[in-house]
Each structure stands twice: as structure tokens, then as C-alpha cells.
Amino acid sequence: MSSHIHFQEKITHTDYEIKMISSGDNFPSIDISESRLHYLLIMIRSCIDIQSIKKELNWTTIELDRHINTLLKEGLLKERKGSYFPACMVITAHEGKELYNLCEPLITPTLQIIEKHSKQIITLCQKIDTFKQLSIETCSLLLYSGILLDFGQINNVENNYLKSERPLRNNKRYYYSIQEKEKINEEAFGIYGNHYLDLGEIQICLYGNKRYTTTNLITANKEMLEEYFQQPVLDVNQFKKQLVQKFVSSNTQIDVPLHLFYEKVGLHKDSKPMTPLFKTADLIILDEIASTISEDLITLFQENEQYLKRYYLSSSYAKEITYEEFFIWWYHFFYTKVTDELIKNDIIKKLDQENQTYLVLQ
């Protein structure tokens, strides 16, 4: 028997991440990874014949038809002239490299935009207590990547450049992507992202590109907490909330085990707090910080629109998704590449923890 691995077998032996941009209750009614439906979408896109797909996924004809209908109903698959196409952005390793290459002409102008507004950015930072208590360097990944380019900027990009609503899928509006994952300890394509755990009046947030492979307060589970503190944990979120309340309260005596735990999950470094703590009023100033570069960034995208659309129209994405959906996922590659350049230029100081934990108090 040949040792050659069929293409469809290679797909099922590759790791993928499902990414989504949504708000409120705008999300799919199904988890496509649970039923291996992401493999079906990738194989259809790779022009693998139906019989080979059935064989590889070990489905009957009835099961395959049911799964196809599920994806059609969900708006993640579409049919045109008897052929099926994914209706979300599937990004293979090869396409990821192309998307990074596509960023190149925009990187230097973006670094210049940030430099142009750097004094204004620092002035605004000085209005926020946590930036006075911690050095800007300590918070630089969150500030220059998260706030300036990623979650602090993306609404501006949608509203003022794309000027369109998110795609409507089964009465829900959201962006959706399946991304090939090459590195075990890093998120797909090394893309930076934001994650938060809402505990009522406290939000624990985490920014970085190794959020799910590092020890942090969001991913800490029941077993880890019980093993570390040697006590039963009945309600994980309530326990985390109490840990954060002790961290926030300046008059609480912190014992050695708790202090070491704060170090372990990235709240402390070298015995000192290193976690930004934002109050509700600070969020308005964070918006102002993001807005410093907004206009110039939108102009840059408008000036490069034909360049970006040429790639889009020449790719398979043109028959699968809108330019707007293509752009928003490309934008993630773009701000990640800008972030990596800012790290190289020592504007962003890389932390030992890889990610930046921060807290928001309502």
C-alpha cells in the first residue's frame, strides 16, 4: 500500500481554529467543529469529490445530505449552479502567507501614522490612573496592538471604511472564519486577539496570541485551582472573582501562596502588580486613544483599496464571501504584522507572560 496520504486525509489530520466576530446573540446555532462540519467545508472548497468526503468522514449518504443541509440553512455553505462553496473565509497555511504578504505595502505607512500621533497617545494615557501607576512599557502590547489596532479600532474600520453590516446568516449577523493552525503553542497564524470573562462588576480580560496555551486567570480551571490552593472550588467563576477582588483591594494582606499564584497567572511580576486596571470612565479615554489614528488608517485603506480588491477578485474568495468579509479577516493579519514590527522596533516590549492580562471594573 502506498505511503502517500490522500489530500482529504491530510485535511482531517490538520488542526484548525474557528474564529468569529460577533456581538450579542449573533452567532451560529451549531458548533461546526463538534460534528466535523469544518472538514466538510474545507474538503468542498478543495474540490474533493463527494464519495471521497463520505469515505474520509465515515458518513452515510443520508448523514452527508443532512450535514450539507445544516450548513446551507446556517448560511455557512452556498450552492450555485449545482456546485457548493463555503460561505465563510477558509484560510489555509498557504493563503495565510499570501495574506501576510498582501500587508507589506501598508506596514511602513501605518508605523509612520502611529509615530505621527505618538505624543497625543501618550498624553491621553496620562489621563488614566493605571497608566500612571504602571509604565507604558508594561502595557505596551495592550496599548499599541489591542487598543490602537485590534478591538479598540475594529468598529471604526467597520463603520467608516467598510460601511456595511456584518453578513446575515440564518437571521444572525457575524463574520466567520476557519483557519489552519500550524504551531501548537500559538494561535492560528500568530494572530493577536482579545478574550474576556464577564464576572458582573469585574471583567477579566486577556490580550495576546497564546491565550489558550498559557497559564492565565481565564483558562485556569477547577482542577488547577483546587490543586494550587488545596481546597474545594465549588464555583470557579466566583472563586476567580474573589481572587481578583483581593488583588484589586489595596488594604488586603496577600499571603505567600496567593502572591505566587498572581505571579503564575501574570497579575504580578517580580513581586509587583503589573496588571492594568480600568474603570468605566477610562473606557472613553481608550476610545479616544484608538481614534487618534482612525482617520489616517481609513485613508490608507481607501488609497490601497484597488490593490486589495485585485487580490480578492483573483482569489477563490470572490465566489465564496464578500469583499467586506475578506477585508475584515485580512485586517487581522495586517494588525498582527504591524504589532510584530512594533515589537521589533522596541515600541512594544514583549512580556515574559506572552499575553497581557487586564481588568475592567464596572
Task: Name the predicted role of every residue range.
Residues 82-88, 270-280:
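Minor-groove-contacting beta-hairpin "wing" of winged helix-turn-helix DNA-binding domains
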Residues 101-206:
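Extended alpha-helical scaffolding regions
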Residues 89-122, 277-309:
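Short, amphipathic alpha-helical interaction segments positioned at domain boundaries
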Residues 36-59:
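N-terminal helix-turn-helix DNA-binding core of bacterial DNA-binding proteins
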Residues 49, 53, 77-78, 267-268:
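Conserved hydrophobic residue
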Residues 45-52, 231-253:
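Short capping segments at the starts of secondary-structure elements
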Residues 7-40, 199-237:
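Short alpha-helical segments that sit at the start of domains
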